[in-house]
A protein has these predicted regions:
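Cleavable N-terminal export/targeting peptides
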Residues: 1-24, 198
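Transmembrane beta-strand segments of Gram-negative outer membrane beta-barrel proteins
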Residues: 21-33
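A broad helix-preferring feature
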Residues: 8-15, 28, 57-59, 119, ...
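Gram-negative (and chloroplast) outer-membrane scaffold detector with strong preference
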Residues: 56-142, 150-152, 188-197
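Charged, low-complexity C-terminal accessory regions
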Residues: 32-34, 99, 126-132, 165-171
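Surface-exposed strand-loop-strand hairpins of Gram-negative outer-membrane beta-barrel proteins
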Residues: 32-58, 137
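Predominantly the C-terminal beta-signal and adjacent terminal strand-loop region
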Residues: 38-40, 47-48, 79-83, 144-198
Length: 198
């Protein structure tokens, strides 16, 4: 009897370990929209705002979870370009403005939906390298997201992600005319992703 009990305990421990701590790799596709960055304080220009343009971001991530908590490392690429906007104009120059970013995130599960879906909240810093006319601008931002994850089949899962980001202005002082005021650059995005459990 003691041998059977020991065998059951060992079997339970070995099967619970992969569930308790799991590695995932993932692919994300997100629609991003930027705001802030610079504003015409004189109201003398038709286009009163200058900012990164809206773009589609492609990302890869590696994450590790322990039951309720987790960490992730994410890298992404997009080409937002440079946008100028006003009341009756919205122009985007896509010949410049490549964006590379890498972020570290911590997350926690805040709710469950259905038998195996989960809602997580993620927070962390990100480093952005915005290549503006051949000059790479490095900015550190704060990002936060709400993520809904659900199983698709076997080891494959899906995710919907709503993200917000705040960063110092992506323009340097010499990039904008004197009548333009530099402001915080902000971004929000909506994305879909796939997660594969290793």
């Amino acid at each position: 009897m003691r041998t059977l009990t020991t065998a059951l305990v060992l079997l339970t421990c070995t099967t619970a370990r992969p569930i308790a701590a799991q590695w995932h790799i993932g692919f994300d596709l997100a629609a991003t929209r930027y705001g802030g960055s610079s504003h015409d304080t004189s109201n003398s220009h038709v286009a009163s705002q200058g900012r990164p343009g809206d773009a589609t971001a492609v990302g890869l991530r590696v994450s590790h979870t322990w039951r309720r908590y987790g960490v992730a490392l994410r890298a992404a690429y997009a080409k937002p370009g440079l946008a100028v906007a006003g009341q009756s104009v919205n122009l985007t120059d896509k010949t410049t403005g490549d964006l590379f970013e890498i972020g570290a995130l911590v997350n926690t599960r805040v709710a469950g939906i259905g038998p195996s879906g989960a809602v997580r909240v993620e927070l962390g810093p990100a480093l952005h390298l915005w290549n503006f006319d051949g000059d790479a601008r490095a900015r550190v931002s704060a990002q936060g997201a709400a993520v809904y994850e659900w199983p698709i089949t076997g080891r494959l899962g899906g995710a919907v992600r709503l993200e917000g980001l705040l960063s110092p202005c992506w323009f340097d002082a010499g990039d904008v005319p004197p009548e333009f005021e530099r402001r915080v650059t902000w971004r929000y995005s909506v994305g879909l992703g796939l997660r594969y459990r290793l």
